[in-house]
Amino acid sequence: MSQAVYRWPKGSVALAAFVAGSIALLFAFAPAYRTAEAKTGLPLTAPLPDRVPPGVVLRVGDPVTRWVFEHNGWEKRLPFRVEWAEITGGPDVTEAFHAGVLDVGFGASVPPIHAVWMGIPVRIVAFREYADRATRQAYVFGIAPKANIKTLSDLRGKRIAFSPSQVQAQIVIETLKAVGIRRQDVTLVELPSSIGGDVYSNALASGAIDAAPIRADLVAQRYVRDFGARGAHILKHPPFRDDGGNVYVPETSLADPGKAAALRIFIHYWGLAQAWVNAHPEDVARGYYVGNRGLPIADARVMAAYTGNVSVPRSWAGAIAYQQAAIDTLGPETKHPRLDAATLFDRRFERIAGDAAASVQGKPS
């Protein structure tokens, strides 16, 4: 029987120390963040202001949305300034919120939950999901070349990458439950996927871990392309959802009337951006993934397909249930308290993005 412990792969000691130190500092100062939170300002129950005063700046971490805004000239229509940040991935967004350098972040199901667990109050202000979520997965399991894993049941006794602050953790726990493997019968290797490069793919290829949830986009394709001859392969996880994406913000930004008014407008355009990406996959491939990221066109098309074909619901009932499932899966496993998922959502924004996306869906561009 394998002991369920957290362990870093060989050769990652310095990186592990840095990440562990950052997380420790974040925990240490989380109470201070709560104490310092504005005690005055716009109540979260107040209607969203209509007027954006002069000088308002929104700091946003969402590179694809930035390209869509710039490509369409939408920034010129905004009565406020957007400062774009190259910040992606739940841990980085949480750190940026804690440091007070970001107003808007994008992440999957777990990052906003984890932020609240760490004492950083955030609210979800927009949600998207796969339009074809019944047949499409955002993540698959990468299997190391010599792991001798043919089916998910073979994960028993293996080393699996685990990042408690990211959706990958939820995928691991739900998969183990679905195939009847107890957590103590595997070794969970704590390894954030956002610490740079293809960290999961490299750890798999080197044999430091046996399995890891990796994105079902170019990451998975490259992994099989580069290491398939050595026996590397991928497996789909059981049929549970992994597709939700959240726009979330610190409550301190919502307490600022000017920023709250700007967020109302920004989320409208964010909804337009989702519809635009759906309708223009080739533009996204060539303009963003080739032009900005330097990918070959074939790889760029893979990424554009992964980014697109999303739906922006006008009701958050399904989104709340989706987030609650993540809380109920990870809370007991990570020793965090149960949350009511509805409290994560700012319902004042519920229809804004969905109405915007619906207003242009299917219209000629």
What is the role of each PLM region?
Residues D256-H336:
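Secondary-structure end/capping motifs
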Residues K76, V116, K177, R225, ...:
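Short polybasic/polar patches that bind polyanions
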Residues V110, G196-G291:
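Pocket-lining segment of extracytoplasmic ligand-binding domains
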Residues A131, H237-P238, S315-G318:
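Short Gly/Pro-enriched turn/cap motifs at secondary-structure boundaries
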Residues F97, L155, V172, L204, ...:
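Residue-level signal for nonpolar/aromatic packing positions in well-ordered secondary structure
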Residues S2-E83, G90, A321-S365:
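N-terminal hydrophobic or amphipathic helices and topogenic motifs
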Residues Y33-P192, G196, D210, A216:
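Short, glycine-/small- and polar/acidic-enriched structural segments
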